[in-house]
């Protein structure tokens, strides 16, 4: 049984196959590959973009979607993860998409399920489909020529599952990664590090990936105000100038903290393209895992 818990679960050849399939799915036409199949979404953390993206992907493939209301679920009343998995499995879904605030939960569920489990984000650990759609966006923009491209990841890197998954995946595809964050947001890493964003860093980048500050994962206040943070790390036109680059963000964007209003409307900012690409990538992932499992 194959699952998608981290980006390491797919090799490079499989990822390129996913990209080819996702490119076909960008036409947004409905398909029947998963007609008669059932996909369950269970999100223990709030989500608008990822949840709706997975559900759109499932429906475009012809699948039925069962969204479990976690606020009313037995898990909120003390049910163990093992019992949650057993009950989910008893419903005989063809795949489950799960998000949880605690790292490792999707892997635990996967050990007790008889269908593929897709990690929709777990704690600070991983968000594999976000990294796949980010690389897909980069790959398409540079027409497949991604090796050696310089990417600067800016923000709350230490607490970001998006950063963790992207660093693994982008490293495998030989992108040149630089991290920019305040010391308390910087992970221990061998990668190039800077503690303040400046125009020289941006001038030396092909891609900027801005991250949201993960305030819900902080045990204490780390900045007197988000405005103080923005002074050092907000992506602004005055820094980007006319540099030929692309700007990514996993969303939701804190405007004028992560990215300025002016840059959000700049043609180099591909946030909405990431959203479109995300549905296509998730279609490719769901199709691959479900049909391989049944083949």
Curated annotation (Swiss-Prot):
It is an enzyme of class 2 (transferase). It catalyses: carbamoyl phosphate + L-aspartate = N-carbamoyl-L-aspartate + phosphate + H(+). InterPro entries: Asp/Orn_carbamoyltranf_P-bd, Asp/Orn_carbamoylTrfase, Asp/Orn_carbamoylTrfase_sf, Asp_carbamoyltransf, Asp_carbamoyltransf_Asp/Orn-bd. GO terms for molecular function: amino acid binding; aspartate carbamoyltransferase activity. The keyword Transferase applies. Its EC number is 2.1.3.2. Carbamoyl phosphate binds at residues 49-50, 99, 127, 130, 251-252. Catalyzes the condensation of carbamoyl phosphate and aspartate to form carbamoyl aspartate and inorganic phosphate, the committed step in the de novo pyrimidine nucleotide biosynthesis pathway. PANTHER family: ASPARTATE CARBAMOYLTRANSFERASE, ORNITHINE CARBAMOYLTRANSFERASE, MITOCHONDRIAL. Belongs to the aspartate/ornithine carbamoyltransferase superfamily. ATCase family. This is Aspartate carbamoyltransferase catalytic subunit. The lineage of its organism: Bacteria, Pseudomonadati, Campylobacterota, Epsilonproteobacteria, Campylobacterales. The gene is pyrB.
């Amino acid at each position: 049984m194959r699952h998608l818990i981290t980006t390491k679960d797919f090799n490079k050849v499989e990822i390129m196959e996913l990209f080819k399939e996702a490119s076909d799915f960008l036409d947004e036409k409905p398909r029947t590959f998963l007609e008669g199949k059932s996909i369950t979404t269970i999100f223990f953390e709030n989500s608008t973009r990822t949840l709706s993206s997975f559900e759109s992907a499932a429906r475009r493939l012809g699948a039925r979607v069962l969204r479990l209301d976690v606020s009313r679920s037995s898990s909120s009343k003390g049910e163990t993860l093992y019992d949650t998995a057993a009950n989910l499995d008893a419903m005989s879904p063809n795949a489950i998409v799960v998000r949880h605030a605690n790292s490792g939960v999707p892997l635990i569920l996967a050990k007790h399920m008889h269908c593929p489990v897709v990690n929709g984000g777990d704690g600070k650990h991983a968000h594999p489909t976000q990294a796949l759609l980010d690389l897909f966006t980069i790959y398409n923009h540079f027409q497949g020529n991604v090796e050696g491209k310089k990417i600067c990841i800016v923000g709350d890197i230490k607490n970001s599952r998006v950063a963790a998954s992207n660093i693994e995946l982008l490293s495998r595809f030989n992108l040149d990664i630089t991290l920019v964050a305040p010391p308390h947001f910087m992970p221990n890493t061998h990668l190039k590090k800077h503690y303040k964003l400046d125009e020289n860093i941006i001038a030396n980048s092909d891609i900027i990936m801005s991250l949201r500050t993960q305030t819900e994962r902080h045990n204490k206040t780390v900045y007197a105000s988000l405005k103080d943070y923005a002074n050092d790390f907000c992506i602004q036109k005055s820094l980007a100038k006319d540099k030929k680059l692309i700007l990514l963000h996993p969303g939701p964007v804190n405007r004028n903290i992560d990215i300025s209003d002016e840059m959000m409307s700049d043609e180099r900012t591909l946030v909405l393209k990431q959203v479109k690409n995300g549905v296509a990538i998730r279609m490719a992932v769901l199709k691959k895992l479900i049909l391989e499992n049944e083949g």
